Amino acid sequence: MSLVLVAVLALLGLCLIAGAILGFAAVRFKVEGDPIAEQINALLPQTQCGQCGYPGCKPYAEAIAGGDKINKCPPGGEATIQALADLLDVEPEPLDAVEGEKPQMVAFIREAECIGCTKCIQACPVDAIVGAARQMHTVIVSECTGCDLCVEPCPVDCIDMIEVGSTVQSWKWDKPLAPGQLIASDREQAA
């Protein structure tokens, strides 16, 4: 019985020593991150499309945390701008004119011309293109962000970016103003 007790105590001692070493290492080698950049990154759409002028969502989040504008993300749109404005306690701005509001585009692969090289699949940051090697590829329209990153690597130039037309699901209209918010000229036009 005493041999078992010695073994248990030896293991307990080793565990305590290893725990102390790990605890010291965790405190000593702690990596400091910017918590606000992580919160901003969580709000971005994670398409990694580069339409904002940065190579991905995390660098853009770090730039926003450093003071860059919050209105450069077309895939996120107005909802992301509003969420970022609420988080950072700043006024929301309309999408930037350079990177900003463009017609919604989606990739279209002319399947008869596709040679199945898979270069577009590798370039797509959101995995919106499906297909196999030496087989035709197609785009999952609901997943495509219109980032245009799949067009350039295509060796046979069979990918086009086409504008998504307005549908019942995507159609938007201006919200009417409350009567107290109308100015005199608006009231005259409404009458």
Swiss-Prot record:
InterPro entries assigned to the protein according to its UniProt record, in alphabetical order: 4Fe-4S_dom, 4Fe4S_Fe-S-bd, 4Fe4S_Fe_S_CS, Elect_transpt_cplx_RnfB/RsxB, RnfB/RsxB_Proteobac, RnfB_subfamily
EC nos: 7.-.-.-
Every 4Fe-4S domain range: 32-90
Gene Ontology molecular functions: 4 iron, 4 sulfur cluster binding; electron transfer activity; metal ion binding
One Pfam family of this chain: Fer4_21
Domain named 4Fe-4S ferredoxin-type: residues: 105-134, 135-164
Domain of life: Bacteria
Keyword set includes 4Fe-4S: yes
Compartments reported by the entry: Cell inner membrane
Cofactor note: Binds 3 [4Fe-4S] clusters.
Binding site for [4Fe-4S] cluster 3: 124, 144, 147, 150
Gene Ontology CC, one term: plasma membrane
Top-level EC class as recorded in UniProt: translocase
Essential cofactor(s): [4Fe-4S] cluster
Entry keyword set: 4Fe-4S, Cell inner membrane, Cell membrane, Electron transport, Iron, Iron-sulfur, Membrane, Metal-binding, Repeat, Translocase, Transport
GO biological process assignments: electron transport chain
Family, as annotated: Belongs to the 4Fe4S bacterial-type ferredoxin family. RnfB subfamily.
Function: Part of a membrane-bound complex that couples electron transfer with translocation of ions across the membrane.
Oligomeric form and interacting partners: The complex is composed of six subunits: RnfA, RnfB, RnfC, RnfD, RnfE and RnfG.
Protein's recorded name: Ion-translocating oxidoreductase complex subunit B
Gene that encodes the chain: rnfB
